[in-house]
A protein has these predicted regions:
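Substrate-binding cleft/loops of secretory-pathway carbohydrate-active enzymes
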Residues: 20
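Exposed, low-structure sequence patches enriched in small/polar residues
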Residues: 3-7, 11, 23-231
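Outer-membrane beta-barrel transmembrane domain signature
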Residues: 14-15
């Protein structure tokens, strides 16, 4: 079990304040805990996950009292809550089964990000979304050939804060080839479906990735990657 904490804040002297502006100095406290549990010497069953909580002040210059009273001097001194404050969580979990001496693997995962989970440490992180996925991974020919079947579902706006809810489901196959005389090869074939009240989007995606290392001399080498996409 691991515990992690982080504090983000904007420097007041680097932000010019104007009445009616849209951007204000912010601060955020982030705490998370992740874990991993395995059963058996060969780790036949593995369970891992992480949960994180975020307390965010969207305007540190807001001097109004919060709508809730926590009656805690520690909270008042360190978190300094006000009417711009919010709290939300994010979590992920993965249940993994290692079968037939690890040659076959079944993975079932889930990722959840609350609508208010926004902070500078994870810029661009999609929020208000719940994702579930399942994968079957099969190793063949001494791990030189790997086949992966996958199914992914995703739903946003579970908080009903958005005007439109978009559902996505995806299924496909990955083929990985790892032979010493040939480039490392991955072929991915996916079917992606998006649907909401305004439109329905369906596409087939084929991706080819080639990776080859070249030894130029005893002390130097080169790596070449070729990636092609068709949809």
């Amino acid at each position: 079990i691991y515990l992690t904490g982080a504090h983000f804040w904007d420097l007041d002297d680097t932000t010019n304040f104007r009445y009616g502006q849209e951007f204000y100095p912010e601060s955020a406290w982030l705490g998370s805990s992740d874990f991993m549990i395995s059963i058996g010497k060969k780790r036949v069953v593995e369970l891992s996950g992480e949960i994180a909580g975020l307390f965010r002040n969207q305007n540190t210059r807001d001097t109004l009292a919060p709508v809730f009273n926590l009656q805690s001097q520690f909270v008042e001194k360190n978190l300094k809550p006000n009417l711009s404050s919010s709290f939300d969580i994010a979590a992920n979990s993965l249940l993994k089964f290692n079968l037939f001496n690890g040659n076959s693997q079944l993975e079932i995962g889930s990722q959840f990000v609350g609508p208010g989970f926004i902070h500078p440490g994870a810029f661009g992180l999609r929020n208000d979304v719940w994702r579930k996925d399942a994968r079957w991974i099969q190793q063949l020919n001494g791990n030189k050939l790997k086949l992966t079947g996958k199914y992914i579902t995703e739903r946003d706006n579970f908080s009903d804060a958005k005007s439109i809810t978009t559902n996505m489901y995806q299924y496909g196959v990955d083929v990985d080839l790892n032979y010493s005389k040939f480039p490392q090869t991955r072929i991915s074939i996916d079917r992606i479906n998006l649907k909401n009240t305004l439109y329905t989007y369906q596409t087939n995606l084929i991706n080819l990735l080639l990776n080859k290392n070249f030894k130029i001399s005893k002390k130097s080498s080169a790596n070449t990657v070729l990636n092609g996409v068709y949809y």
